[in-house]
C-alpha cells in the first residue's frame, strides 16, 4: 500500500480507538499499532519515536502529514 493508504488506515484506526476508549487511552494504545503499520518502511524509526510523544488526534494527524 502507498503511504497515503497507510496514513488513512492509521487515522481511521485511531478514530475508532478514540470512539471506543476515549482520546487519552486511544492515542496511547495506537502508539504500538503505528509501529506495526510502519514496520519495514524506510525511515520509519523516527516516525515511531515521534509518535510516542503524541497526545491528541490532531497532533497525530500533523505528524503523519509532516512525515508523508
Indicate residue ranges for each PLM-predicted region:
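Alpha/beta catalytic cores of nucleotide-metabolism and tRNA/nucleoside-modifying enzymes
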Residues: 1-68
